[in-house]
């Protein structure tokens, strides 16, 4: 296999046995692909597909005026260029978006002509607001913050059949129902009631008999019965009836008389129940008619009206129950033939017939009126209104749309073969649904499972944005229709008709405040990726937490390979927010698909198919771990498979598909947990969730025991710098990498230079630090896709969320009681868990009524010492170390004239002092924060003079841009001249630049020539002359282009900023805060083993082994057995082996052993103990040495999920590292030097520091802000609040009779206003007495009682 630039430097020993059939797909594809389809950027108008924005426009346009004499048509749209790039948007706090310009055509028809002749056509581009762009990492920058739009899992449109699980009626009878759910429009429900009649509801309103809907559709009673029932035909013969016999219909009935065949042989005796055997005999005998007595038909229902043969008078309407009287009338009228409905109690119930009987309507109009009354109660119905309402409900494309998905699901469910069709319902659709419902009630067919992933689909960003856009367009449509009538007469242009505000507002609202548009979780690269791959059942059109039951939240068999069964939040959202499985993707309809290998006749092929939950149901799917021989044939006699959503075993020849990988079941976060298969599911859930909260440490440290997914996550998350094209590193420093691109990858006419600017010390959404460090050095060769710089939490292109710590599992003086963690001081000294947090503090100068606020260093009543970190503009220097209360930005606000004291008047008179009319409102460092200023940004409103600091910042930025562009030009020029040199050397010159005709050009000559002079050479070969001219033109073009670019950037920098109304200036100060680990911080492993640091012990007191190596962390062994996360123990053992092997390699390097020995030892590690084979022969000696140097700290291992290291392999690794195979060793007490009495498990575990830091939670208050009504202190750290002393705490003090404590808690410490001020004064004066008064909350109580109309007064003595 080929190794990438970083893989070569550090190979991870992989224990997986199964081959990689398929790489893990790009992890952010679900976001990027969806939005790309929505915008269709870079596609020409002619090639626009009917999706996304284009589809939204086509669904609303053309807009036709009310009179029909004018129309506005949509032609196409184009997207402009963004005003700022992503970084500038974040800095300025604006949205990263492009202007949308739509070309529309206004057509005015001639009113006079009969055939609508066109009178006038105007075409124009209209601005329709801004559309946010997605960044290349799948996020949106909205008002300067990065946001993610989470995909939504909602019920697919279509038709669903269900029952009430016997909960509605006390008898426990199952009441079946059907529901047609469109993509947009009214819901249509059919349901049975306990008496077995069928009812219909529209939009969950009052129910009507279902026959009302059928009548409204234009069906007569007879047509309805004809559609739903077969008929029995009876012929009248004298005193008896003859039935046209269909033998199957007799099954289960009791014979009323003997049934004989033609020869007179009795087939069924009278009184016997007719069985399947009897029916076969009747079929064989070929009996076509059966004599039955007259009373056989009493109680049956007529299928068609019975008419008097002579007079045409109706004797019995259709759907009438036959009685003896009716039979007598029929006999009298000589009716010879009539038909009844065929019903029975087993599989053909009389439900529709019964419904027709309770239906009061008789014709279509009555039915329409009935529906109108139900939809619009209290409005007088008219024929037209009723018809319009009914047609608009389900048959108008504007109001109702099943969508392509809905139509496909609908047709599949009712058994049609075609999957395409109209977006609106038809009469046949409604009848087909009713038929299916009746069939299910009759026992044919089954109800749907709504939690099946074939019935739930994913709505991604693009689709939600399109819906929102359509909502905006529909709002515009109304306004346009009204203005179109004016356009006919007044000659308006399209621009005057369309107001883009509603569209822009709808889009802005969606991206800014929709429930699914979330502030990106940016703790570390994994949390970013997971957030973008999240699938939520909540949100508009989805479920609500309160209504979601247990079934929706549960793991469903169809989740396999589509949605992770492990990763979901704990708490109220459990099961409603899920994560996409590693290999899952959505299909064109939005259903989740999982990949499988095709198996033919027991042989596994390399063909891969993606199947949705519906498509895979009939397949027999083997697991990825099924044993295969060399030919790829399944060898076991019985293979463990999934079939019809059940786990079972089948013979190899029955198998049709096979999983592609064992990790296709779990999500990205879960696939990063080594030995996941040994952890309990609940702990694995905590483990995957806590990895997302890990704070990037100062120096990232790759996990010694990983799973092999680390590289994919780091690469796809976008925090690393990945080479866009291969080439040679031309120059590299801490802030940028310049690559000279390989000739074969350079497109014609472009520079062939890629400049990568690195992100340095930037703030993330969670205030962690984003910083990139280059991995390459000058002259290195990189290929496309290689990782050139590490980001936060990545180490050589691998995800590195924490640190490898030497842990021992043993109790230690009670310091690790209840999951506490005992740390060694060495961890703090080595800055292993030191993290950098960046805080942004903002100071805003506004225009007030009394005059503008000013930012300056001239602040009243502030000493010199407080100002020594500010420059003359009043803004803190970059690099200043500041602490709580320090001034960062000096700001003064004018205050109203107050009454002056005589002293002030005197001062005023003497000095003309005006210091008193402003107050100090400077930006100060908040309490508990200490750090270094790393950056300052100043934004000034247009027309306000910029201060010296703003100008200095601008100059610095311009210098950087100029340096970048010069560098680019230098490389372009260099590359061009290199190509010229190779062409010119050895060629014959004609003259120019002081050369004689016929001289051959040499390298030395060119070196001595100024570059500008090269172009004066005249060559004998015309092609060379042409090349020289082209080169000269190319270089001057580039120069011009780069100058233009610089001017453009300069213009952007110098133009004023677009600030909120009333804001003159904004200063943003960025503080870098360094946090060491300390007691109270939360730490965790990757197996859900979390704890709080309880104590940091001196190194010399920690337990150590026989060599004197102390452990870093002591964990409590009692945390393992009851929690069943044994993965952490296996990780510890394998980690010990990894570290031991690293130490062994280090000793070999120190002893300067031969490279051959190193090579042999590395081959032993990588190729002799299980797992993947590594090709070390392709490494040169230098590369082997570099590899060995990188392995000194430990040989990283990969134990993939469900395909990891076996116990025997861990032991073999320990043996190879010369360590005890038990993984346990004798430890000594650091304080006494005594040996502990039994061996202890010691090894290396990967520990994370979570973003729950004690510094952020620590909080204390003496006095502060109070609530307005109750006068009690506010709550919470953000409000600088107090601790609530609630009713249960009051009971506790009452129980102990602590009267004085209780009194001060309820009065002076809380809401006795006078008492607390007096108390504060007393304490200041050193007098510790209190005088409690009346608590304010008592007054509130009195007011509340008075508001009930009860007069209450407190009588004071």
Swiss-Prot record:
One of its GO terms (biological process) is DNA-templated transcription. One of its GO terms (cellular component) is DNA-directed RNA polymerase complex. It catalyses: RNA(n) + a ribonucleoside 5'-triphosphate = RNA(n+1) + diphosphate. Its EC number is 2.7.7.6. Keywords: DNA-directed RNA polymerase, Nucleotidyltransferase, Transcription, Transferase. DNA-dependent RNA polymerase catalyzes the transcription of DNA into RNA using the four ribonucleoside triphosphates as substrates. This is DNA-directed RNA polymerase subunit beta. It comes from Ectopseudomonas mendocina (strain ymp) (Pseudomonas mendocina).
